[in-house]
């Protein structure tokens, strides 16, 4: 099994990456291959590259920072293009969304991202709480013990 994780932040190794890395580490521990793909650049060639990887993946996790109580504009544009190009390759694959915020807006962000999954008949994988981490820097996210535990729970549930 292989899981493709899309980092919807324009910051390659920021807070969203930190959260996705925790999920990937847990998936790897369960014997599942992972790849974190930098989706913070919605350039069409970048989306095409992700579409090729999605075709080979068995599951998808989409992570985004929270901007104005919503996913980043970059990941929205990226997902709009990806669904147009590769929607057929999304059908029935397990999926999950991850939100990273300094404070608030995470549940609204998760709701927007999960609409892409619902439309493509993707079973949504959850954790023992909302899939979110809190912090303004990767170091702060690394101190969010509850958030990181949620990421590990998500990884274990995706592996199941």
Residue map of PLM features:
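N-terminal beta1-alpha1-beta2 submodule of the flavodoxin-like/Rossmannoid cofactor-binding fold
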Residues: 1-87, 138-160
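Short, glycine-/small-residue-rich phosphate/pyrophosphate-handling segment
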Residues: 91-134, 145-150
């Amino acid at each position: 099994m292989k899981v493709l994780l899309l980092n919807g932040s324009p910051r390659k190794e920021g807070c969203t990456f930190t959260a996705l890395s925790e999920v990937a580490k847990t998936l790897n521990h369960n014997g599942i291959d992972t790849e974190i793909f930098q989706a913070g650049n919605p350039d069409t060639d970048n989306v095409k590259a992700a579409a090729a990887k999605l075709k080979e993946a068995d599951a998808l996790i989409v992570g985004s920072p929270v901007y104005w109580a919503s996913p980043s504009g970059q990941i929205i544009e990226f997902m709009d293009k990806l669904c147009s190009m590769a929607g057929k390759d999304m059908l029935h694959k397990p999926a999950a969304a991850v939100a990273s915020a300094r404070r608030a807006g995470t549940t609204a962000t998760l709701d927007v991202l999960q609409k892409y999954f619902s439309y493509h008949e993707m079973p949504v994988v959850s954790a023992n709480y909302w899939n979110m981490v809190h912090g303004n820097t990767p170091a702060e996210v690394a101190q969010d013990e509850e958030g990181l535990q949620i990421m590990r729970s998500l990884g274990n549930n995706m592996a199941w």
